[in-house]
């Protein structure tokens, strides 16, 4: 054994060839600060071996290296800029020394090689991969850019265009694509990986392959003419500005850095990467996006823990076809759980099957599946007008109209047709689960399962625990949601549960702004362009359906009369009374017409002004700051109340529910992350300016207490140890 660290070791293989093996404790290899330091020590040992002829890098895990250790990021990013820059220089010196070894090097790459894992293998001369490879640089999705030389080596290896596509979008690619663009040199079956890598290494040692020529371009300026460079970078900057926008600085910074570094050799180019990385690491956007990644891991880990002792449902049923029922049936069947879809009329069943078929055909058009797979999936959805096959189902989700009487009747009837241990769930969006449970003989086998529309796109499923829902019931439904590829978050029962309960105060803030003379177009523009929501409140209401919102508003007002009961007629009432229900009937805040792709396109409609004039004061202008404050304070206050009341268990789950269920701007990280970034004391000062607007603007007591000491909701993070202790030499 030449060297043994905690996460990697170095040993001789044969006749002057050494192997460096990543083998961390636990299930995956990560390139954390300790591993980077250990890698440096191992390379130091290699540099002393006069008889070294070649080096093989490999992993003892199912994945090569999944990336840097993101759990270290928040503390690492709190380190002062100069120290962080110093540590990056040290880390890059390690990869440079790997690249500069006086012998050929090859990485045998299996499974994932992402972020730092990808940057590590870019420093070797050759890369041989297995068919399950996923390789790429996802850093821009975390609000940063590659920091271990990825923005320097990848463009020089692949050419600017292919590298920019991966780096700016934070993409990873599979084995075939990686081979096509030159990111790997070959793809072999897993059992042939080491043998194949050794064969390439021997050829390089024997002089049959010119490894020095392979290495050289990575050390030099980018080979691009002035015209080529102008074309590549101008197009890339235009594309990034369009897709990422101003709220995500990392992608455009990465492109500009690669452009600036194009005329330099490796050392100067790495210095530019360092100078760009460090300020990005200190942005609120990076903290928020890293926070989302960590929260996502936490939520998924919690679901895994919850379901470890239950069997995932093998057969499901959906009550109520239509668009929602068809979407749920498709998602279940697509992920391998056959489903019976029941309705009381053929027309709805046809609609449900058409929806499922439409979604499968889209997969076919995109080349994700072939005709055989399509036929196989659709054959596992069984439409029916009766209860045939219900004695075999493990879980049933009811997705009929949002009416408690209808839902109770359907659930009670279904309970008589299924096994004693079958779990029933209701896809209600507002009706309390404990109320629906009153109609059942086995309320312990019942819970809520709130999908979001469109089902195939929206990652969140709210799992609602009723007063009598058993732990096993919740676990089974969480297991089914996870199997469907969704992110399940368990919440306690109340009107609107979590997501809708916090959404309607936001809509109430919108209604009050309109009442006070604000222009709905300006509100939408500010909430989209400045705050970053995917849709402003007016457009969102049109998409949700004015009739749906009108009904839900009444349910919420009955549930929380002290805050959500209005004492005035608002814009939602006015549009509802005028039969303007939004996109579904082509008339809402806007008029809708289908574009060439059959998608609804909004147009101005003068008739809306007259309707809104009836429920509004004369038009007046509001500042962007006031619009954001008046829209967000009611939502944030309600989010905090939900945490204080135990409706949602943690700030992490609340923020993920908002991001995945409502499209809360990821660069803010969710309501609690936004609140922590702003500071609870500053938030309280802002909210108190608007408390005259009513109970929705009254800050909950728990938040007031935090504001006294400006306490955050997330546990405070300490900066990483001084970077000198992280090994900078």
Swiss-Prot record:
Q: Which InterPro entries match?
A: 3-OHacyl-CoA_DH_CS, 3-OHacyl-CoA_DH_NAD-bd, 3HC_DH_C, 6-PGluconate_DH-like_C_sf, ClpP/crotonase-like_dom_sf, Enoyl-CoA_hyd/isom_CS, Enoyl-CoA_hydra/iso, FA_oxidation_alpha_subunit
Region Disordered: start-end pairs:
708-729
Listed pathway(s): Lipid metabolism; fatty acid beta-oxidation
Output the Gene Ontology terms for molecular function: 3-hydroxybutyryl-CoA epimerase activity; delta(3)-delta(2)-enoyl-CoA isomerase activity; enoyl-CoA hydratase activity; long-chain-3-hydroxyacyl-CoA dehydrogenase activity; NAD+ binding
For this protein, what is the EC number?
4.2.1.17, 5.1.2.3, 5.3.3.8, 1.1.1.35
Q: Binding of NAD(+): at which residues?
A: 324, 343, 400-402, 407, 429, 453
Binding positions for substrate per the UniProt entry:
296, 500, 660
Q: Set out the biological process GO terms recorded for this chain's protein.
A: fatty acid beta-oxidation
Instruction: Cite the position(s) of the site with description Important for catalytic activity.
Output: 119, 139
Subunit-level organization: Heterotetramer of two alpha chains (FadB) and two beta chains (FadA).
Q: What is this protein called?
A: Fatty acid oxidation complex subunit alpha
- As recorded in Swiss-Prot or TrEMBL, the protein's gene is named fadB
């Amino acid at each position: 054994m030449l060297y043994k660290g905690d996460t990697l070791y170095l040993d001789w293989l044969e006749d002057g060839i050494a192997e460096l093996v990543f083998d961390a404790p636990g299930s995956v290899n990560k390139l954390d600060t300790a591993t980077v330091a250990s890698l440096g020590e191992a390379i130091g040992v290699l540099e002393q071996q006069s008889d070294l002829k070649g080096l093989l890098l490999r992993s003892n895990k199912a994945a090569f290296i999944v990336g840097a250790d993101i759990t270290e990021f928040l503390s690492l990013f709190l380190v002062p800029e100069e120290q962080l820059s110093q540590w990056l220089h040290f880390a890059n010196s390690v990869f440079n020394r790997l690249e500069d070894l006086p012998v050929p090097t090859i990485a045998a790459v299996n499974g994932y090689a992402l972020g730092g894992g990808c940057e590590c293998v870019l420093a070797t001369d050759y890369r041989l991969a297995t068919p399950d490879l996923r390789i790429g640089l996802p850093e821009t999705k975390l609000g940063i850019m590659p920091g271990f030389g990825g923005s320097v080596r990848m463009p020089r290896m692949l050419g600017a265009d292919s590298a920019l596509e991966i780096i700016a979008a934070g993409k990873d690619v599979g084995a075939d694509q990686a081979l096509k663009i030159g990111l790997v040199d070959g793809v072999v079956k897993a059992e042939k990986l080491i043998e194949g890598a050794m064969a390439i290494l021997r050829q390089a040692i024997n002089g049959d392959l010119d490894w020095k020529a392979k290495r050289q371009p990575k050390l030099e300026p980018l080979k691009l003419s002035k015209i080529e460079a102008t074309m590549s970078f101008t197009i890339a900057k235009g594309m990034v500005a369009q897709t990422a926008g101003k709220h995500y600085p990392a992608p455009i910074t990465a492109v500009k850095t690669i452009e600036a570094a194009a005329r330099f050799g490796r050392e100067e180019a790495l210095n530019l990467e360092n100078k760009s990385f460090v300020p990005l690491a200190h942005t609120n956007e990076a903290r928020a996006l890293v926070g989302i990644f960590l929260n996502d891991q936490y939520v998924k880990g919690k679901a895994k823990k919850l379901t470890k002792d239950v069997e995932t449902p093998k057969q499901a049923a959906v009550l109520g076809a239509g668009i929602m029922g068809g979407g749920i049936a498709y998602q279940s069947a697509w992920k391998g759980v056959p489903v019976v879809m029941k309705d009381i009329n053929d027309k709805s069943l046809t609609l449900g099957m058409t929806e499922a078929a439409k979604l499968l055909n889209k997969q076919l058009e995109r080349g994700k599946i072939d005709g055989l797979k399509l036929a196989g999936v659709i054959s596992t959805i069984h439409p029916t007008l009766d209860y045939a096959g219900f004695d075999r189902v493990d879980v049933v989700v009811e997705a009929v109209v949002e009416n408690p009487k209808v839902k109770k009747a359907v659930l009670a009837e279904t309970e008589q047709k299924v096994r004693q241990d079958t779990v029933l769930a209701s896809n209600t969006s507002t009706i309390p689960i404990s109320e629906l449970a009153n109609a059942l003989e086995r309320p312990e086998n019942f819970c809520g399962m709130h999908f979001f529309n469109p089902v195939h796109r929206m990652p969140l499923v709210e799992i609602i625990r009723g007063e009598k829902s058993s732990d096993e019931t919740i676990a089974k439904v969480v297991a089914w949601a996870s199997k469907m590829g969704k992110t399940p978050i368990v919440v306690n029962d109340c009107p609107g549960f979590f997501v809708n309960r916090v959404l309607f105060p936001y809509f109430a803030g919108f209604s009050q702004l309109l009442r006070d003379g604000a222009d709905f177009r300006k509100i939408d523009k500010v909430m989209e362009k400045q705050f970053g929501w995917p849709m402003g409140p007016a457009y969102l209401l049109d998409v949700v359906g004015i009739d749906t919102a009108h009904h839900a508003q009444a349910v919420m007002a009955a549930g929380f009369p002290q805050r959500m009961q209005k004492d005035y007629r608002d814009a939602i009432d006015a549009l509802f009374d005028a039969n303007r229900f939004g996109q579904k009937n082509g008339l809402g805040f806007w008029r809708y017409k289908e574009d060439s792709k059959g998608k609804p396109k909004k147009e101005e409609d003068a008739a809306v002004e007259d309707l809104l004039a009836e429920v509004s004061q004369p038009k007046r202008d509001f500042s962007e700051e006031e619009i954001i404050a008046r829209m967000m304070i009611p939502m944030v206050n309600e989010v905090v109340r939900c945490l204080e009341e135990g409706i949602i268990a943690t700030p992490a789950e609340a923020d993920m529910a908002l991001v995945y269920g409502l499209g809360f701007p990821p660069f803010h990280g969710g309501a609690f992350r936004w609140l922590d970034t702003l500071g609870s004391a500053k938030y309280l000062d802002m909210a108190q300016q608007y408390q005259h607007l009513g109970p929705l603007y009254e800050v909950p007591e728990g938040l007031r207490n935090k504001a006294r000491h400006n306490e955050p909701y997330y546990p405070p993070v300490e900066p990483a140890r001084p970077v000198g202790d992280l090994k900078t030499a």
